[in-house]
Amino acid sequence: MRKLLTIFLVLLLAVMAADATRTTITAVAPTIGTAVNGANLWTATTSSGMLLTSIMQGNQLLIINTTVTSSSLWGINLTMKKGVGQYSVLGDKIYTLSRNQTYIIGPLSTSRFEQNNNTFLFDFNASRGKLIAVNLP
């Protein structure tokens, strides 16, 4: 039993260390009459993984703008990581996003993608774009 507990703790620490390398995105909730500098809200996509905080019962949208600075014909793949809810048995969700386009993805399902620590995890296969997360009212 003690050996199993030790193995579990080592695996837990490995998972926690993996999440520490993810870029954290905090969803914004723009309100009427509040000046917001839109340029400061966007976060560059990273291929090392991203983490969305400020979950509000699945009322978030991801707005993703894919950009290509080279002559590449490819866009990016977005993988929403399965969570721990009842629909997590459906697994990860992969979106293929063409280059130089803007996409709105969501509202994000907490019953499929929410993690134990109330976050969403997602990965991009390349760092070609920027995104913003928006909380809906």
Model-derived features with residue positions:
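Sec-dependent N-terminal signal peptides
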Residues: 4-14
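Transition segment at domain starts
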Residues: 19-53
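Short, surface-exposed beta-strand/strand-loop-strand elements in extracellular ectodomains
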Residues: 69-89
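Terminal connector regions
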Residues: 113-137
